[in-house]
């Protein structure tokens, strides 16, 4: 019973780390990356679709993204969707391909992004601590129900704490890498 609680806690903590990593990946750095356009929705054939479904996004160089639209008639809609997004990008059309030069980040903008990234990291840490709290309370319920001994409870608390420390360390490493990436000019 305790083993399933520990496995569940470990799994939930790794999901928290992954979710935090994904949230941080959405924060734009000075470098071109296809995931920058993941959140863009395009109006096509009367409904909204993710950009991935109507075009292929690639990286031309460190400061330029290319968007190859599958259907030439959709180029205008894709261009409009990119321009109306809050990313501040201005695509240039070349047939069925859009080139999107990424403007370099100002020092002030970089610091704003670092604040956002630190906030995401803190949210990840909080989620991990909540998982720890839940796991420990589950184990204590087992102890009250006389399903395990006090030694088992202490052992499992130590194990949960080790997983918590490890997960928070992973988030801190991801944060440090992202901050370094943001501060590169």
Curated annotation (Swiss-Prot):
InterPro entries tied to this protein: Ribosome_recyc_fac, Ribosome_recyc_fac_dom, RRF_sf
Record's subcellular location: Cytoplasm
UniProt keyword annotation of DNA repair present: no
GO molecular function: ribosomal large subunit binding
GO CC annotations, alphabetized: cytosol
Protein function: Responsible for the release of ribosomes from messenger RNA at the termination of protein biosynthesis. May increase the efficiency of translation by recycling ribosomes from one round of translation to another.
Family: Belongs to the RRF family.
Name of protein: Ribosome-recycling factor
């Amino acid at each position: 019973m305790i083993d399933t609680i520990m496995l569940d806690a470990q799994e939930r903590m790794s999901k928290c780390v992954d979710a935090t990593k994904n949230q941080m990946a959405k924060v734009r750095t000075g470098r071109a990356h296809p995931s920058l356009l993941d959140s863009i929705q395009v109006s096509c054939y009367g409904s909204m679709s993710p950009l991935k479904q109507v075009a292929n996004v690639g990286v031309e160089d460190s400061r330029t993204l290319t968007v190859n639209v599958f259907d030439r008639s959709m180029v205008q809609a894709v261009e409009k969707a990119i321009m109306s997004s809050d990313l501040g990008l201005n695509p240039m059309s070349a047939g069925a391909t859009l080139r999107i030069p990424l403007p370099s980040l100002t020092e002030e903008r970089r610091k704003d992004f670092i604040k956002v990234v630190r906030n995401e990291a803190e949210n990840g840490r909080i989620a991990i601590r909540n998982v720890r709290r839940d796991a420990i309370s589950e184990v204590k319920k087992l102890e009250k129900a006389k399903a395990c001994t006090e030694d088992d409870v202490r052992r499992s608390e130590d194990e949960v704490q080790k997983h918590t420390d490890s997960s928070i360390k992973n988030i801190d490493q991801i944060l440090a890498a992202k901050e370094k990436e943001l501060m590169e000019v």
